[in-house]
Regions:
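Catalytic phosphate/metal-binding cores of nucleic-acid and nucleotide-processing enzymes, i.e., regions
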Residues: 1-131
Length: 131
């Protein structure tokens, strides 16, 4: 019997780490399309990433369907990560959470600036005319 963690145990760590960081870790099942990544990660601020899980030491085959999907998703601007150990799973969740926080902060600042610029309590439309 081996002490190496199985892909399922890495998947459990990823799911828990993503949820702990405030994201969703959805199992991606796509009938009729073999080789799609195992998980889709969603974080506030529009952060979407895909994850192909492998047991430790295993890699995505260069000419396989999983690699084709990784390239195809990248063409659409979606990152696809390969995770094959528990540390990578935890680090990916932390990195995506940090990016989510950064985007939300930028959006909040942009909205504050927009409201400030758009707040004209006395402007040309508010002036009385001498008609």
């Amino acid at each position: 019997m081996t002490n190496k963690p199985l892909e399922k145990s890495i998947e459990n760590v990823l799911r828990q780490a993503v949820e702990d960081e405030g994201g969703l870790c959805l199992k991606w099942v796509c009938p009729g399309h073999k080789g799609v990544p195992d998980r889709m990660l969603l974080f506030p601020g529009g952060i979407i990433a895909f994850v192909e899980l492998k047991r430790p030491g295993a890699k995505v085959k260069a000419g396989g369907l999983q690699n084709w999907w990784r390239q195809r998703l990248a063409e659409f601007g979606f990152p696809c990560h390969e995770v094959n150990d528990k540390y990578q799973a935890q680090q990916l969740a932390a990195d995506l959470s940090a990016e989510s926080f950064r985007r939300q902060t930028e959006e909040e600042e942009a909205m504050k600036a927009w409201h400030f610029i758009g707040d004209h309590s006395e402007g040309p439309d508010d002036e009385e005319s001498d008609d």
